Amino acid sequence: MKIPLRFLLISLVPTLSMSNLLGAATTEELSASNSFDGTTSTTSFSSKTSSATDGTNYVFKDSVVIENVPKTGETQSTSCFKNDAAAGDLNFLGGGFSFTFSNIDATTASGAAIGSEAANKTVTLSGFSALSFLKSPASTVTNGLGAINVKGNLSLLDNDKVLIQDNFSTGDGGAINCAGSLKIANNKSLSFIGNSSSTRGGAIHTKNLTLSSGGETLFQGNTAPTAAGKGGAIAIADSGTLSISGDSGDIIFEGNTIGATGTVSHSAIDLGTSAKITALRAAQGHTIYFYDPITVTGSTSVADALNINSPDTGDNKEYTGTIVFSGEKLTEAEAKDEKNRTSKLLQNVAFKNGTVVLKGDVVLSANGFSQDANSKLIMDLGTSLVANTESIELTNLEINIDSLRNGKKIKLSAATAQKDIRIDRPVVLAISDESFYQNGFLNEDHSYDGILELDAGKDIVISADSRSIDAVQSPYGYQGKWTINWSTDDKKATVSWAKQSFNPTAEQEAPLVPNLLWGSFIDVRSFQNFIELGTEGAPYEKRFWVAGISNVLHRSGRENQRKFRHVSGGAVVGASTRMPGGDTLSLGFAQLFARDKDYFMNTNFAKTYAGSLRLQHDASLYSVVSILLGEGGLREILLPYVSKTLPCSFYGQLSYGHTDHRMKTESLPPPPPTLSTDHTSWGGYVWAGELGTRVAVENTSGRGFFQEYTPFVKVQAVYARQDSFVELGAISRDFSDSHLYNLAIPLGIKLEKRFAEQYYHVVAMYSPDVCRSNPKCTTTLLSNQGSWKTKGSNLARQAGIVQASGFRSLGAAAELFGNFGFEWRGSSRSYNVDAGSKIKF
């Protein structure tokens, strides 16, 4: 078999080190031939016993599985691997292979799988890809004594996966009983599940335990199910020590229990008389979870303080991870029993670094508590911190804001005579994530009376800074102000919330909705310009035209305004006729299809039907001025200077369009993290009116490219409105109706060039918007009733417009024409292209 390089390294390192230490240690190689299965084997299982005083090394050359021992009808009273009392160290060197014990029913053996009688010697299992102890023995063996039992020390080191499950002992340590020191370190995956002891330590019993995670570490469902049982997962012997370090993975204690039927309670760890925790720490990004409490045997206090998240002396490593004590996994019935929620230590506790979290109504009890500035203590309402003999001194107390509405209180107690409670910095309202400020209850003001209760034997000292409150705010969601008020005797504190406003997230805002009115604005102006274009050309009595029309509007993004784009296209049909009085009447209809997008979450599809009516009156400039001057001296002075042949036109136009919108919203709502697409429909309309006049000046000099110059001035008004609507989907919002009003006075000049069968003109104009109401609407998030003004873009109020048109005659009855227009504003660009044909008669 080809062995991976990493496994060779794993096996080489301990082998070399052991060789240096043991010198003449006995070495035996194990391979697949050493496997045994009692259900298929024709021979009885033979245990291996080590007696070499210099120690024994078992070197694995292949994976080994020992299962179903003994054979049916036989008994097994000796450990599968035994180390005699006079023997040296016992080492199992995995070399990257697996080692499995399963269903080992050794009736009286101290350690069904591995037993060592050698005091002050060490049993080591290292370098395995998988190391498993399963039902060794199972609980069906009424006098079993665990999977591993050593009278010296034990080390489980540098294994990829360790699974220790469903083992049983009538004595201490359902899976492991170690009289000396037990070291478990750098295992990439470690699980103690469903192990059981009739006395102490459902999974582990030892004098001294060093537990350092190399990956996820789980203690789940272990139990000491007797009235005298202690330590559902781990029991530390009297005067022993416990060090727990979440160095490279989370450590979880969950569902571990003690007690006989009817008196079952949760217990993660039990500390024997005068036993102590020497280290409880987690590295950055890792957490130690105590869903079951820590208990103590006896009442003797320990002098050494527990410095949480503190490195060993001389070690510069920083521990900034999180330690969680939680009752969240308890059933409602279990939570009623305070024993299931109370962790007790007979030491002073100092919060040195990182974060300690109390959740789910737990009580953390110790001799006294102190806190360094680099650490945080986060407490849910309903949790308690109890100092039994000393004071409580806190510098960074944080209240979990998510628990504010549970109707409970945080309690700090240092009730021993002459002991104080001191809070030196402002209380902080902590949030787990910014989505808290999306909660609908923040839509109203609230007061949470007496949520912090203090009970001291002597003084309660609240520094001047601590009489204020620091709240972790979010730039999104409900905005408001948090305040804290202390009672006269400082024994209670009340926290209040005053709402101010609501700020939507980028996903909630949807500025595309009001910006759709700018699309209607562009489309109706382009339509009106096309009707004017349809009347251009040779002066026939009647004409009918059909054409395609397209428009593009691009609005650039700004710091507080999202960019968007509007694209539309469709068909226009129209007709014009010269009336008996010489006026020209034009009529047109259009159907447009549009697509709008905000380059983020929203895309709109629209369909517009529009109609327009245009009336043009042609006269000489002389007759117009004559009417305007009326009778009097001014007429006689000015009128002689006015040309009697210069043509002048007056025109008016009125247009109406109805639009049906269908918007698509794509969102990523948690949970689950799957893309959601929702469609919403609503309607709107647009009115547009225009009045204008122009004077055509013929170039009679013969010089210059253009033959006619036509200055003009217009007054354009556009009013667009869209209905209110409710969007249903992952992000459900209620949008009020919105409107856009714009009044512009374009002025410019048209330059014309005619040929025998062709006709061109170029238009340049300046168009200031003299009066405008920008689009906006009120948006309400239905999930929390948060409401805000969604503002559309504010296009620059001055525009430069250039248009170029061409006409070509196809005989006496037909004409082709095309038009290109470009509008420039400081914040946007728009284009339109039209092309079609006319039939003249």
From Swiss-Prot:
Residues 1-24 form the signal peptide. GO terms for cellular component: cell outer membrane; extracellular region. It comes from Chlamydia pneumoniae (Chlamydophila pneumoniae). Residues 537-841 form the Autotransporter domain. This is Probable outer membrane protein pmp2. It is found in: Secreted, Cell wall; Cell outer membrane. It is a peripheral membrane protein. Keywords: Cell outer membrane, Cell wall, Membrane, Secreted, Signal, Transmembrane, Transmembrane beta strand. It comes from the Bacteria.
